[in-house]
């Protein structure tokens, strides 16, 4: 957090990236990550669910643990690696199903971009038109396969 203050004091805007669903993540640890993002209150943020891309160390771990992967038979294929896809299939954790990680990511996105502190900072930094755009953006909810169909992940 101190680094962010230092960077801002030099006149830079801050964009931050956060990943939910690493192998040892729990709901509590993901909440801590979200809380950190809210304290930092950066000008832009990206929230990702961890993905075990082929060739990555996470893919090796997922294979060893027999965790479901997008390319597995009966799963969505490569589209499952797309963060915003209907068929998104992120990495599960030791404690959470992939669908729980994805739901947390989606809720975290809305929590952040609807927070009063973020909207107030955005208005004073970028103006009311930007806040209007963000409010329109957050009025749309991502459609996810596991909300409409029974899935086993």
For the regions a language model picked out, list residue spans one by one.
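A general structural detector for well-ordered alpha-helical segments in enzyme core domains, enriched
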Residues: 2-6, 29-36, 104
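Conserved, mostly hydrophobic/aromatic
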Residues: 16, 37, 55, 108
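Conserved strand-turn element in the central/C-terminal portion of the radical SAM core barrel
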Residues: 4-29, 44, 48-54, 87-98
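Hydrophobic alpha-helix feature that most strongly marks membrane-spanning transmembrane helices
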Residues: 5-8, 12, 35-38, 52, ...
């Amino acid at each position: 957090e101190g680094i962010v203050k230092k960077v801002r004091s030099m006149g830079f805007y801050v964009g931050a990236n956060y990943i939910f669903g690493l192998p040892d993540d729990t709901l509590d640890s993901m909440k801590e990550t979200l809380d950190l993002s809210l304290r930092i209150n950066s000008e832009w943020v990206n929230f990702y669910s961890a993905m075990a891309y082929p060739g990555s160390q996470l893919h090796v771990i997922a294979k060893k643990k027999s965790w479901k992967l997008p390319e597995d038979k009966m799963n969505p294929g490569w589209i499952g690696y797309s963060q915003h896809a209907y068929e998104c299939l992120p990495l599960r954790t030791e404690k959470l199903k992939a669908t729980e990680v994805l739901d947390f990511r989606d809720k975290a996105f809305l929590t952040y971009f609807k927070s009063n502190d973020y909207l107030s900072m955005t208005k004073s930094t970028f103006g009311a038109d930007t806040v209007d755009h963000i409010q329109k953006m957050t009025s749309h909810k991502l459609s996810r396969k596991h909300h409409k169909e029974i899935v086993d992940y």
